[in-house]
């Protein structure tokens, strides 16, 4: 346990107001022994502060678990509490280490650092806490709101008609099928909402944080739009009822259509005013609407028990009758909508309102409790009400009635048909002529007619429609506000601003109002409803899929406290929601899915920088893990060989050409790892290692290079590369090729660095790697051109100064991207391959993969091989035959018969002058002196080594002459890398070979040597 000296008085409560001070944390004093536990001070065990260094009675900066350490935010005016970092607990305590802790503290606002304390008591803040926003419980905030949104105009005006068409049995099936979808969705949303702290944004917040910004953003936008259109639908339903009343009393305003528009616009304006008054007033209005609906229900039920008057009897109401109930059990389809799915499509929108409570999640006291409890209770009670009304009204009212008081049964006036005959009424004439204006199947206002006092039903219609419209208005603005704050789409941030203590989305209300007015102009309920239903169903499908996907990923982060859900039920809910979308209105379903896909593709293209820990991310990990483990069971086969490259880039932005070259042929094909060795003491380079890794990865992503970045700390370069070659990769996904840049300054650099460079190539062969060395005429390192050497992020040791740990890794991403030859079109040039020695085919495979890419596809590939002048035709045919079996598409083959001729004298002398400074000149020295010189300078070339390697040295000089003759204008030159035997070829001689081989060549030169194992085959198994 980390301990600190007791520097304050133990009993002084005023000093125990924080966890620790920076000065105490970084004190260089020797720690004192742990303080003994004092039972007279129980606060030692209960006080959350460790400023007095008392945790379980010990003198330590280690802290006990507390809520604040895991919270992302604090209450207004309260300081943020932080736990000590790992460095705080186990690093040396000294003043020089202050910069190690600065990052942890400086990120907080200045008001959180009071009097040098890391944290203080909330009561010490001089700022007065702002007024608390209004928060609602599960009844007022969720259940009532959901019930009001579920109940709507269909309950009063269409449910009796649906019962008459489908019969009581099928109506119950329609209701229960609809409730099945909403109940499964309710269970799914309950699970999602209890898997962590829920903020404002409702359905959008839940889906986006579960499935990610791609699907979440698209569904959030259309869900907000659907709610805005829902305002229009419900107000139009309200306006239709008012218009009918005006016409009944002979007081129309203008004409039927414009009356609806006028009434609806006035109504939605009043609802806007209620919303702008704040959530508190909106909630009061909802409670008032709820009471009105409850009174209307009671009024209806009482009315069914009252014996019918003559007026009601003439309209088909006869109170509870068994024969009426039996007759209305079976369907009687009429009209164009007279089908099961026709009735289902009309009823289903009345079940969609279960998200009203979740949509104001930011205004709930405890969303994790309120959303599941309130939503499921709302579904239960509204289902009971639908079933009860369908059964009761189907037991009281016949399907057809004339409404004429004189249509009583009169003896001698012919046959009387129908159940009404037994009750003294004859509706035969209007039934046969299909001219009845009343009855369950003809009169939409049947509930008003049956009720004890008709105006109360009208008031219930008003309450149901206006409350639903108000809930939709609030939901649209709240969801859209959260979407705007996340900035997933352009040009909408303006509407995200909140006002007042509740952060009311005033601008969102105005936008929803404008959309509602635009759709109110349509003034046709049957045109508006299908679009909304499909958007809501699309939301339900994604909510259920979110729950299913989060469950199957087995992510440790999926721990919902609501356990009464099932992943397969959630999947069924998602599928059935999509099916219902097409059953309701196929064209509206296609529109909804098309909009979702368009918005989805936009967010995928933009790649917003958000990280919400979505189940999609967890699923990606699961897939990667599963396939990676599965690869362990796959035996290696030549046909499945892929060039998996470990590229020694250092900081990738230093050598963009090297990154682009490898990234071109490995893209969507194989593994690429950019390796970076930080040289120096582990303690010194560790802060830099932690800071820059993420920045380099983002740089690669910005450059559209599909690669990993891996860095290690080592005492020297060679040891670091050895670590990378042994540890990089995972399972079968391990590098098999080492790619390095050519050491251009080898003649002027310290010989030890050259020794390390060549040693790295030898190590690669020892680890059975292939080797690829890339040389460009202008060099690979662009750090000086970018002036990166003055930035400690890029190379902190370059100026010989200690790197500061305070570095902004975003500088790596924001820097200007250097362009390279591998990013441009190559045109109709050539890729020349000098396949001088058989390395297993890697020298052929890399250019082939490069030639498949669009920028290199127009290049003609030429293959050059060595041969004898008297066997040129035979050798050429043999190579062409071999290449055709490899199916590489290489048809132009050139034999080099003069490869073993002596080079020109001036070129030979140039080579000798190149190695002269590195010669040991041991011809006249004794053996002891030579051995000592060799031990001190292993890179030196002895006379014996020059003699033994003379033929090989002259071959490199001659090859350079040949390449200059044939490939001066090529786009790329690929040459088999010569190998120097360990212990027989000094590093300086080997570097001279590579220098000579690629000297004066204008195109990029790639020196490749495989590990002498086949990477190409012409067999099919």
UniProtKB/Swiss-Prot annotation:
This is Solute carrier family 12 member 3. Homodimer; adopts a domain-swap conformation at the scissor helices connecting the transmembrane domain and C-terminal domain. Interacts with KLHL3. Interacts with IL18R1; this interaction is increased by IL18 treatment. Predominantly expressed in the kidney (at protein level). Localizes to the distal convoluted tubules (at protein level). Not detected in normal aorta, but abundantly expressed in fatty streaks and advanced atherosclerotic lesions (at protein level). The keyword Transport applies. Residues 244-255, 304-338, 394-453, 523-527 are extracellular. Changing residue 234 to A/Y: Strongly reduced sodium and chloride ion cotransporter activity. It comes from the Eukaryota. The chain crosses the membrane at residues 138-167, 168-189, 221-243, 256-280, 281-303, 339-360, 372-393, 454-477, 508-522, 528-544, 568-587, 588-599. Polythiazide binds at residues 149, 227, 234, 352, 359. The modification Phosphothreonine is found at residues 46, 50, 55, 60, 124. Residues 1-137, 190-220, 361-371, 478-507, 545-567, 600-1021 are cytoplasmic. It comes from Homo sapiens. Changing residue 55 to A: Decreased phosphorylation by OXSR1/OSR1 and STK39/SPAK. Na(+) binds at residues 148, 151, 464, 467-468. It is a multi-pass membrane protein. Changing residue 475 to C: In GTLMNS; 40% residual Na(+) uptake activity; increased MAPK1/3 (ERK1/2) phosphorylation in response to IL18; no effect on localization at the plasma membrane. Changing residue 70 to A: Abolished sodium and chloride ion cotransporter activity. Changing residue 158 to A: Strongly reduced sodium and chloride ion cotransporter activity. Changing residue 19 to A: Abolished interaction with OXSR1/OSR1 and STK39/SPAK, preventing phosphorylation and activation. InterPro entries: AA-permease/SLC12A_dom (IPR004841), AA_permease_N (IPR013612), SLC12_C (IPR018491), SLC12A3 (IPR002948), SLC12A_fam (IPR004842). Changing residue 192 to T: In GTLMNS; associated with deletion of N-566. Changing residue 468 to A: Abolished sodium and chloride ion cotransporter activity. It is linked to Gitelman syndrome: An autosomal recessive disorder characterized by hypokalemic alkalosis in combination with hypomagnesemia, low urinary calcium, and increased renin activity associated with normal blood pressure. Patients are often asymptomatic or present transient periods of muscular weakness and tetany, usually accompanied by abdominal pain, vomiting and fever. The phenotype is highly heterogeneous in terms of age at onset and severity. Cardinal features such as hypocalciuria and hypomagnesemia might also change during the life cycle of a given patient. Changing residue 223 to A: Reduced sensitivity to thiazide diuretics. GO terms for cellular component: apical plasma membrane; cytosol; extracellular exosome; membrane; plasma membrane.
